Amino acid sequence: MGLFFDVLSAINNPNQQGSVTQLESITNSIQQLATSRGIQPSQMQTVMSVLGNVLRPALQKQQSTLGGNQLQNLIGQAIGTSASASGLQSLMSPQLQQQIVQTVSQRTGLSPNAIQAALPTLTSAVMGLLNMGTTKPGVSGSNSILSTFLDSDRDGDTDLGDVLRFANRFLNPSAI
């Protein structure tokens, strides 16, 4: 739940870019994708967990190569291209994309073609979530959400599937 608490903190912090509207947009895009592809909510939660576990080391490597600010800029640019293949390729090599497709497919039972088709939308949603911790222009500071995600000690506090589940509960308390 640690990462979700950072999301809530970013929403409540006037110096960070996170908002309830952003969180709703991210969860809605994931829900629409799941509905259009016939993916059950529990299966989508698993998809997000696996995606986060595969993306984390790739982003950690980029952070060590490029530096934290450059990684943040790259994430911002990828979001700006919306769920497009070019935005995806700016963050991940085709080899990494293929690894993600295979890993998610193996762990969820979804077809590789379904994962490949969903990957730009899913990655855009993850990057949007990670970008919510960015400080507003003119304010110094680091992205707390991205830092928490990358500095994970693998205790489960940064599971993107859990973040999706808690976000849905937060946004739709009557649906619990």
Outline where the language-model segments fall.
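A structural "flexibility-hinge" signal
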Residues: 1-176
